[in-house]
Amino acid sequence: MYDYIKGIYKGMHKDYITVENNGIGYKIFTSGNTLYETPEKDEEIKLYIQQIPRDDSINLYGFFTEEERDMFNLLMTISGVGAKSSLSLLSVTSINKLKYSIVTEDTTLLTRAPGIGRKTAERIILELKDKFKNDDIISDIDDLDSISNFQLHSAEALEALMSLGYSQKESEKALKNVDKENSLEDIIKACLKYLMG
């Protein structure tokens, strides 16, 4: 069982990143929060790892903080919530805002995550709300919405830029230097403006 992996960040793909360690490239699935925090290509990265065995493979899930990994594992204890749904929830908002939505029984934010319907959101609230009542939860974090949207769209924007002929390194640099606009179209436009000088 791995606790964390430290290696060289080799690039972002649609729903995972590649980290090289001792000549081996590890395919690591990540949340939007972690994708947003990735360094420049070929720089060092450290991710806290959760291994999940499948019928024919072992999938690795990586997070920048132990807190995010703990939340990922906690979400997966809920019936009907798997790894993909847990990553979706961690991609649409911050951990604090997710906890706040659960404690205040607000399903709106939870159902923004792909794969999470109203019934699943209600089940998450029912089973987890008591776990967070004593936590220091930040409620005044509406300004994170634009960052959350950026997290959701960054991988798609990267793919679009590379399909236009820009290298992965150029595309990632552009994404790190644009304003966190709300729509995917605006993010791509801002990246193109940056790349064209």
Curated annotation (Swiss-Prot):
Annotated spans, Domain I: 1-64
Keyword Iron among UniProt keywords: no
SUPFAM superfamilies referenced in this protein's UniProt entry, alphabetically: DNA helicase RuvA subunit, C-terminal domain, Nucleic acid-binding proteins, RuvA domain 2-like
Gene3D superfamilies xref list: 5' to 3' exonuclease, C-terminal subdomain (1.10.150.20), DNA helicase RuvA subunit, C-terminal domain (1.10.8.10), Nucleic acid-binding proteins (2.40.50.140)
Pfam families, sorted: HHH_5, RuvA_C, RuvA_N
Residue span of region Flexible linker: 144-154
Keywords: Cytoplasm, DNA damage, DNA recombination, DNA repair, DNA-binding
GO terms assigned for molecular function: ATP binding; four-way junction DNA binding; four-way junction helicase activity
GO cellular component labels: cytoplasm; Holliday junction helicase complex; Holliday junction resolvase complex
Quaternary structure (record): Homotetramer. Forms an RuvA(8)-RuvB(12)-Holliday junction (HJ) complex. HJ DNA is sandwiched between 2 RuvA tetramers; dsDNA enters through RuvA and exits via RuvB. An RuvB hexamer assembles on each DNA strand where it exits the tetramer. Each RuvB hexamer is contacted by two RuvA subunits (via domain III) on 2 adjacent RuvB subunits; this complex drives branch migration. In the full resolvosome a probable DNA-RuvA(4)-RuvB(12)-RuvC(2) complex forms which resolves the HJ.
Entry's family note: Belongs to the RuvA family.
This protein's domain notes: Has three domains with a flexible linker between the domains II and III and assumes an 'L' shape. Domain III is highly mobile and contacts RuvB.
Function, as annotated: The RuvA-RuvB-RuvC complex processes Holliday junction (HJ) DNA during genetic recombination and DNA repair, while the RuvA-RuvB complex plays an important role in the rescue of blocked DNA replication forks via replication fork reversal (RFR). RuvA specifically binds to HJ cruciform DNA, conferring on it an open structure. The RuvB hexamer acts as an ATP-dependent pump, pulling dsDNA into and through the RuvAB complex. HJ branch migration allows RuvC to scan DNA until it finds its consensus sequence, where it cleaves and resolves the cruciform DNA.
Name the UniProt record assigns to this protein: Holliday junction branch migration complex subunit RuvA
